[in-house]
Amino acid sequence: MIVKIYPQNPNRKAIDQVVAVLENDGVIVYPTDTVYAFGCSLKSPKAIEKLKAIRDKDGELSIVCADLSHISDYAKVETPVFKVLKRNLPGPFTFILKASGRVPEKYLEKRKNVGVRIPENPIPQQIVEYLGNPLVTASVRDEDDVIEYTTDPELIHEKYGALVDLVIDGGYGNNEASTVVYCTGDEPEIVRQGLGELVL
């Protein structure tokens, strides 16, 4: 199933349809401010397993939060790190932080860190707001494939439509992933330079 949602003015009925899929252990594909991404509810162990199987990679999953206070529910955020987050979010960044006790074991799998995002795109922002908890997320990206399929929702639907429960057509996406910043040490460390230019 593919659903058209305009990021400039997301339709509440369509967002509710997406939320209903997520609440029923569904996996979706949705637009961000970078590449398209797979997503499921953090509260659904069944959906997290399904997402991992679709992704078929060992790469770490991240979570999408609604705002900075939402991040502090799921990660330990010291004051200097909070200031960096505040300067750069919403935006095309994934910040790696120390996970709090509210992050399910199914997500962590013996890891102590959690990647967090707040994309600058109203579609995922509203999905998380109305779902009431973060999305577990992983980029629709394969280094061995032609990268175009990550930008065109119709092509994504052709490739993954039978594996996911819903694909959101939010227009063409970007073909560059987020900048990944580790904030678990003394200083923020960029481990992957992507679309965003970090402001310290």
Regions found by a protein language model. Give the residues of each.
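Active-site-adjacent structural elements in enzyme catalytic cores
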Residues: 1-200
